[in-house]
């Protein structure tokens, strides 16, 4: 159970009551506690979350017929985020081309991948053969040209509009015309990033959360010119990667970062007004 939930303690109370009293009294007490719980704001919130998670992963207007098979992926940027994203694909059995301009950073990323999988073997999470398979499926390189046969490339470089625009242009220059390009930006305007490209319909957002190979949430961002084909593909890809893939629109910080940004401001406002959240 999660901290603060009412139902687990109610279950304990009902069980204790059933031991200490007769059958009829226990049934009546259990019914009373159930009515309290099922009509509580907490129950309403939990039901909303349950159905919202399922609706959010199935955006309207997208068809499974438009999903493009992803047989090989590219990741540009071998920092913490790029390394984690590469492992997301490797974990799903998708070979990865990892592009990084800094040779030292690239070597460090490859070592991190190997160390992570060695630890997984030591802890019994994967077999040694799986470790070798995943490591062999990673192709580290300094050259954008190595992306030529990728079905999708995820950009995961520094959060700077100019830097990302240059990187995206280099990616597009070396990709097939039908390949998809995803940016991992956490707050930049996807439409502005795609504006200078020849095929903006192939550009989408895939906002992973760090550590990318562990965190389940994935914000797939719908740009103004993102094609239904591109959007349907990243939704299906998110599921294949084992993520809760939620489609969001272009906005400042999208959804998760926007909530995170606003929460401290709300808390500070309460503190300044000497207001407790319970009030």
Segments the model singles out, each with a brief description of its role:
Residues 1-69:
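Intrinsically disordered, low-complexity segments enriched in small/flexible residues
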Residues 19-38, 221, 225, 245-279:
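Substrate-binding/catalytic subdomain of NAD(P)-dependent oxidoreductase enzymes
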Residues 55-116, 139:
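NAD(P)+-binding Rossmann beta1-loop-alpha1 motif at the extreme N-terminus of oxidoreductases
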Residues 67-72, 135, 150, 178:
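Phosphate-coordination loops involved in phosphoryl transfer and adenosine-cofactor binding
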Residues 103-151, 161-166:
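Conserved N-terminal Rossmann-fold NAD(P) cofactor-binding segment
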Residues 157-158, 186:
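Short glycine-/small-residue-rich Rossmann-like dinucleotide-binding loops
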Residues 165-237:
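Rossmann-fold NAD(P)-binding glycine/threonine-rich loop
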